Amino acid sequence: MQPLSILVLHGPNLNLLGKREPGVYGSTTLAEINSLLAEAALKLQAKVFPLQSNHEGVLVDAIHEALGKHQGILINAGAYTHTSVALRDAIAAVNLPTVEVHLSNIYRREDFRHHSYIAPVVIGQISGFGVQSYLLGLQGLVAHLKG
């Protein structure tokens, strides 16, 4: 059986994980998160393909290119969660099962972070568990895909 192919998208400023506001986002780097996801994916008979970009259009293009290439998407859109209709529309357009994750609990933060444009078009959202948000999101996505 072929492993499931999961696109993992990391949005703006996530390249600074480990340095940026460790009290909010923790001390784990993006490279470490990607490594943990790759390990977890192997155990779940899946493979992850991570991409980080600070540019909305790059993320939209990656979502479009996922069609026919990946079975699902795991996304931490960062600040674009609260601002990007383009990401929301791209996810809706490709209609691939997608899980939204956040390291911090976006509902315990500033009011403007309480709204997600992405949440209505994904199968689930996990926030507030630090690095575990990614791992739980991956588990949930794979379980959904395996039906």
From Swiss-Prot:
Active site: 25, 102
Keyword Lyase: yes
Principal EC category: lyase
GO molecular function, a single term: 3-dehydroquinate dehydratase activity
Site (Transition state stabilizer): 20
Residues that coordinate or bind substrate: 76, 82, 89, 103-104, 113
HAMAP family in the record: AroQ
Protein name as catalogued: 3-dehydroquinate dehydratase
